[in-house]
Regions:
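Conserved HGGG/HGGXW glycine-rich cap/lid loop of the alpha/beta-hydrolase fold
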Residues: 4-53
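Active-site loop/oxyanion-hole signature of alpha/beta-hydrolase fold enzymes
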Residues: 42-81
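Gly/Ala-rich beta-loop-alpha elbow adjacent to hydrolase catalytic centers
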Residues: 84-92
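Hydrolases whose catalytic domains are alpha/beta-hydrolase-1, hotdog thioesterase
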Residues: 91-95, 215
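Flexible "cap/lid" loop of the alpha/beta hydrolase fold
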Residues: 97, 105-136
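Conserved alpha/beta-hydrolase catalytic His-Asp/Glu region
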Residues: 117-118, 138-196
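Conserved serine/cysteine hydrolase catalytic core
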Residues: 178-221
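Catalytic histidine-centered segment of alpha/beta-hydrolase-like enzymes
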Residues: 233-245
């Protein structure tokens, strides 16, 4: 795992946590310059997903422990805020629940927080991985009909699908199937406690309403007092398509 840092050393720390199988620069490259004038930006590059290392993603808890160890060593165990994109929101929840480091603000970016039994998680992972992994490795679907369907969807949906795929990243042949499998599976089976409440920590959630009404209940299940920022958008559409608005909202919360 690597941590890339930007901005002044004495500025308040903002931790950025990428989404599922995303490359850190593709995920956050457009917004880091918008944040680095106000924060010391730390962007996590997970084990198995950084081109400068030969590693594999272990488990959510092992990766969380590495993040905590870094923050204790380099930030005194206290940061201003953490933003988690999709899967990264699970890390924000775990960091809050474990209370091994302290963050003043935890922000989840329309995370689904899906959880499943080991059997169900294994079945879901085994079904999705052959579809998703070629996109990670080669930058496109292996099945031609899926690629054609995606291309058609991208044309019909305007900027969102193109922006989302760009955020996902280009072809990355260095990422192993095992890393993707471990990340998918581990995220599903790692429990996130209910009614998380940490004195001195505010939880904010960018709630993409087009994902569905069930997520409101899910956010309120896992967090005792979440502040929901409702947006009539799709999953992580604010970050993918409106980086300036996204950065403004993050600053309005954490500054």
């Amino acid at each position: 795992m690597k941590i890339y840092h930007f901005g002044a050393e004495d500025a308040p720390v903002l931790l950025l946590l990428p989404g599922t199988c995303c490359h850190w620069k593709s995920n956050f490259g457009a917004v880091i310059p918008l944040l680095a004038d106000s924060f010391r930006v730390l962007c996590v590059s997970y084990d198995g997903f950084d081109e400068t290392e030969q590693t594999e993603f272990p488990t959510m808890l092992e990766e969380t422990e590495k993040i905590e160890a870094y923050l204790k060593t380099h930030c005194g165990g206290h940061i201003r805020a953490a933003y988690g994109c999709s899967l990264g929101g699970s890390f924000v929840g775990l960091l809050a629940a474990r209370q091994n480091i302290h963050m003043d603000y935890g922000i989840l970016g329309s995370s689904d927080l899906d959880q499943a039994s080991p059997l169900t998680a294994s079945l879901q992972t085994d079904f999705l991985l052959p579809l998703i992994y070629p996109v990670v490795r080669d930058g496109k679907f292996k099945a031609k009909f899926l690629q054609k369907r995606l291309d058609k969807c991208a044309k019909e949906s305007g900027d969102y699908v193109k922006a989302f795929l760009k955020m996902f990243g280009d072809a990355r042949p260095y990422v192993t199937m095992q890393s993707c499998k471990n990340q998918f599976y581990s995220d599903l089976i790692t429990p996130l406690p209910d009614k998380i409440h940490v004195p001195g920590t505010e939880i904010h959630i960018f709630y993409a309403l087009k994902m569905g009404a069930k997520y409101r209940a899910r956010y309120q299940q896992h967090f005792a007092h979440p502040v929901l920022h409702e947006q009539n958008l799709q999953h992580e559409e604010l970050l993918a398509c409106h980086p300036e608005q996204w950065a403004h909202l993050v600053k309005s919360i954490a500054l």
